[in-house]
């Protein structure tokens, strides 16, 4: 008897974009282990695996106060662009900033006009008639901060928010840091430097790169070098300072920052409905 359901096959298709038969084979091969099935399909060349897994039907907005950013969710974009909801979200961001909230629990406990943010959002939810959620919060420490909020359309509130912490002086430094924030919004860097990538993530990527290389039939002696090359490509995709600059594709983000006298010390990126 199969250790998976039709719902598992459907979800795997949505996440990987692979065909039904491939999804069934992957689940059979992994004895129903969903995460391993995703890896199997990725090795076999499924496109956008991992990126689609982050998607969610959730609506809402991103709000920033000082060096704190919050995500608050609604069920529909109709509510997300409601003036009362947007005003409430900014008050929540202010309250979260006051306590330097970094967890959903700290966000929920933040004081909002004498009541917790958790109680306040329940009241607003009852009034609006739609489920609302305090999703997450982060406070980014740093000498200076650049903030970028992106709206998907003019009539909707920000759906992407980025905080970039940096050191540097003058208008050129400010402009460079802002460009870095826009880069994070667009290219979705996951780490600042390759040293920030967890060891388990590196090992997983190395393993996948090796399996792909072997399946391509490359000579055994060439495999280590090819794997390292693919790992370097991975770093250039996910590490901010190693990405090609959107402002000048001939330079890395680090080179652009160095020229402006900027040192990036951290960043955070939120997108509504994503992990």
Curated annotation (Swiss-Prot):
Region Involved in Mg(2+) ion dislocation from EF-Tu, annotated ranges: 76-79
Keyword Nucleotidyltransferase: no
Family: Belongs to the EF-Ts family.
Family matches, as CDD domains: UBA_EF-Ts (cd14275)
Organism encoding this protein: Corynebacterium diphtheriae (strain ATCC 700971 / NCTC 13129 / Biotype gravis)
InterPro entries with a match to the protein in the record: EF-Ts_dimer_sf, Transl_elong_EFTs/EF1B, Transl_elong_EFTs/EF1B_dimer, Transl_elong_Ts_CS, UBA-like_sf
A GO molecular-function descriptor: translation elongation factor activity
Keyword annotations from UniProtKB, A to Z: Cytoplasm, Elongation factor, Protein biosynthesis
Keyword Glycosyltransferase: no
Cell location: Cytoplasm
GO cellular component, one term: cytoplasm
Protein name as catalogued: Elongation factor Ts
SUPFAM superfamilies per the UniProt record, alphabetical: Elongation factor Ts (EF-Ts), dimerisation domain (SSF54713), UBA-like (SSF46934)
Protein's job: Associates with the EF-Tu.GDP complex and induces the exchange of GDP to GTP. It remains bound to the aminoacyl-tRNA.EF-Tu.GTP complex up to the GTP hydrolysis stage on the ribosome.
């Amino acid at each position: 008897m199969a250790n998976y359901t039709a719902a598992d096959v459907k979800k795997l298709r949505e996440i990987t974009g692979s065909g039904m038969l491939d999804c069934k084979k992957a689940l059979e091969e992994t004895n129903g282990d969903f995460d391993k099935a995703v890896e199997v399909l990725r090795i076999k060349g499924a496109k956008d695996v991992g990126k689609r897994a982050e998607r969610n039907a959730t609506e809402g907005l991103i709000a920033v106060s000082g060096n704190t950013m919050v995500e608050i969710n609604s069920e529909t974009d109709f509510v997300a662009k409601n003036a009362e909801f947007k005003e409430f979200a900014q008050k929540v961001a202010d309250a979260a900033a006051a306590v330097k909230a970094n967890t959903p629990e700290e966000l929920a406990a933040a004081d909002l006009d004498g009541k917790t943010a958790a109680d306040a959002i329940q009241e607003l939810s009852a009034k609006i008639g739609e489920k609302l959620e305090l999703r997450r919060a982060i406070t980014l420490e740093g000498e200076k901060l650049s903030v970028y909020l992106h709206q998907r359309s003019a009539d909707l509130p920000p759906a992407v928010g980025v905080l970039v912490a940096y050191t540097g002086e003058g208008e050129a430094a400010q402009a460079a840091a802002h460009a870095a924030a826009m880069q994070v919004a667009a290219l979705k860097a996951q780490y600042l430097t390759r040293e920030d990538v967890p060891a388990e993530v590196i090992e997983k990527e190395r393993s996948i790169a090796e399996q792909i290389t072997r399946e391509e039939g490359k000579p055994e002696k060439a495999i280590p070098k090819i794997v390292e090359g693919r790992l370097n490509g991975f770093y250039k995709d996910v590490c901010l300072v190693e990405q090609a600059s959107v402002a000048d594709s001939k330079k890395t983000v680090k080179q652009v920052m160095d020229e402006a006298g900027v040192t990036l010390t951290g960043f955070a990126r939120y997108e509504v409905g994503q992990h």
